[in-house]
């Protein structure tokens, strides 16, 4: 356990006074930190020989692959001639199908056709979003060790696949498309993920790449990749752009500045469970209710009927982007009854209006986080097939006071295009040597300190990769081990944030509290993957943890809740912080006085003086024990001032008797960093 304890009372100590020497020994080392923000392999001489590196947009509903060759970026078509490939995997009695072939037989083989796997990857089975999603999936999802597994029948036998395996199959398909085009083997790739994918989801995506035989060199946020596609030809004046990425299953918004080939992410927000699939589900539910009302038949329990309805609902949604009404016709839909209904654009918009409006909240958030106004935005870039919906465009343009969104890039292909450019940077392709990508992390990362306080090491919207270190110490005398509890979130107290993982550093040499120095380092790489280490500065012993994909990171609902609650309860959080800091400062000060009086100063103090100081120490410790939960920050500060007033003259006299040449006692010194934070 850590405690964030910093002294608000400084002692101006003569260099010859033993008491001041003691304090000098336990003064904190200045916090060290480095932030390597301008990172992305930049020039040809910096890259390894990876061969041709491909860029893959691994989407919820569709995936896309691109490659940079001879300075030009190509979006590659599959064997059907399509430049986007359905993220579907299906098993028949004879074979495994991936892409268009799998999607085309989904209605007739719903139990063995897997889609929307991106909504399960990197999440635990008991995650509320997983539980919500599996209710609407026709295939079976089972629980194994609190991890979702997909169960299908393969050649007459039950077979279970992890989301990583299924995603690996889709990545393998993209790899094959690239190899067919290039005529050679491909081993390295850049893969995109939603900006709000957490560490577990990113790790799982890298694992999927390994399953597909791909070394994923870089995980790039989807809106950032789209910004590269949009901004390659805008290399002079600075542009502030909003990338609005509404895909099949996820939604991201990023605010970037582009100038002289530098793409800097200012802020990012989003929802990993919002997209075209949700709009489809609204239609499916609407049509199922209409059918039940007309025929008194519930089709929701019939997987084949629901798969047919889903297929036609998606077609209807797409057609309504270019026309105002469409008709859904399904022969022998259920129990031999045909299905026939008309859907207008107005009805589609009515059913989904709440979801459309929900996308504006992250837009407001990135503006607030970056400190910019609507008027400061130069361009709005639309990414993802769902941005073709007229109502979505209308709401977004209205939000920006009538500013028209840019339609200069294909929303289905922009992310893969940007990924291919980044791949070209890594493989040393000509023409992209000067591109620099500055991305950010989505949530604050920190550790628990005494009192359950969240002590941040890497703040939200920090440019990545980055590395930050801070010195901590022990919370009790002769503490032999410390447990490092790693959290993500925006609240002041760890109970309101999400635990990512923990580990223990043991065999610390016995010493009074506050003396050992434990250096904790957070390293967040360019893929957004976190490694935490702790080193005992005395012995050199070190332990570390990489937050891996089995740690159960946050769902998007949790992320949204954290940010909203952080804003809503900002005053409460500030009060908690102030109270905790004041309590820790007072308690630390009392213990240091106690240890000093019983230690080096014991031989030079009068017994009466020593007794007086220790009486004050014991009275203060008793007060702390009785009042820590109920006292406010002001109470701790008052007790601190009273304690200091009582003991300071006595300690100053002891220092003077030791041979202080200055004859000075103690003076207030504006120094908030007298003591190390404690473990």
UniProtKB/Swiss-Prot annotation:
GO CC aspect terms: endoplasmic reticulum lumen
CDD domains reported in the protein's UniProt record: ASKHA_NBD_HSP70_BiP (cd10241)
PROSITE patterns according to UniProt: HSP70_1, HSP70_2, HSP70_3
Enzyme class: hydrolase
Main location: endoplasmic reticulum
Coiled-coil blocks: none
Keyword entries, A-Z: ATP-binding, Chaperone, Endoplasmic reticulum, Hydrolase, Nucleotide-binding, Signal, Stress response
Region (Nucleotide-binding (NBD)): 147-301
GO MF term list: ATP binding; ATP hydrolysis activity; ATP-dependent protein folding chaperone
UniProt key word ATP-binding: yes
Listed Pfam families: HSP70 (PF00012)
InterPro entries: ATPase_NBD, BIP_NBD, Heat_shock_70_CS, HSP70_C_sf, HSP70_peptide-bd_sf, Hsp_70_fam
Notes on how activity is controlled: The chaperone activity is regulated by ATP-induced allosteric coupling of the nucleotide-binding (NBD) and substrate-binding (SBD) domains. In the ADP-bound and nucleotide-free (apo) states, the two domains have little interaction. In contrast, in the ATP-bound state the two domains are tightly coupled, which results in drastically accelerated kinetics in both binding and release of polypeptide substrates. J domain-containing co-chaperones stimulate the ATPase activity and are required for efficient substrate recognition.
EC number(s) given by UniProt: 3.6.4.10
Signal peptide per UniProt: 1-43
Region (Disordered): 652-679
Region (Substrate-binding (SBD)): 421-521
Catalytic activity: ATP + H2O = ADP + phosphate + H(+)
Localization: Endoplasmic reticulum lumen
Ligand binding (ATP): 59-62, 118, 248-250, 314-321, 385-388
Function: Probably plays a role in facilitating the assembly of multimeric protein complexes inside the ER. Is required for secretory polypeptide translocation. May physically associate with SEC63 protein in the endoplasmic reticulum and this interaction may be regulated by ATP hydrolysis.
Similarity remark: Belongs to the heat shock protein 70 family.
Protein name stated in the entry: Endoplasmic reticulum chaperone BiP
Organism field: Kluyveromyces lactis (strain ATCC 8585 / CBS 2359 / DSM 70799 / NBRC 1267 / NRRL Y-1140 / WM37)
High-level lineage: Eukaryota, Fungi, Dikarya, Ascomycota, Saccharomycotina
